[in-house]
């Protein structure tokens, strides 16, 4: 574990949190997965498309889904709706402004590129303190 992640983990108390990663960029998805795992978060995915995310949802019930809003040219609004229907908190990540996200029910929006510190803050925002482990 990197010293940065170790220091954050000591304060994060996000152990056993289950997060679904939905990101079409292999590099971003793997970096995100590695960072989450360093924080002792259980990671499902990454999924590169809404269909892949749906298949993972059939197998697991994540607490939070981190979703890139634009997945290979397909906007993820329908997936976000389905995640909300299942009680999964959604964090949208995007490399550009997407005004339509304001119309979606999301716990938070994280602008790419983002730091480990920003990711941790967003996860804390997405999970109320009463539910943090």
Features from the language model and the residues they span:
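Acidic catalytic/metal-coordinating carboxylates
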Residues: 49, 75-78
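Hydrophobic/aromatic residues positioned on beta-strands within the core alpha/beta folds
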Residues: 93-94
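Non-catalytic signal-transmission and effector/linker regions of two-component phosphorelay proteins
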Residues: 1-18, 51, 115-133
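A Lys-centered signature of the CheY-like receiver
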Residues: 112
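Conserved acidic carboxylate
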Residues: 23
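Two-component/phosphorelay signaling modules centered on CheY-like receiver
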Residues: 26-45
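Acidic, metal-coordinating helix/loop segments flanking the phosphotransfer/catalytic sites
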Residues: 46-64
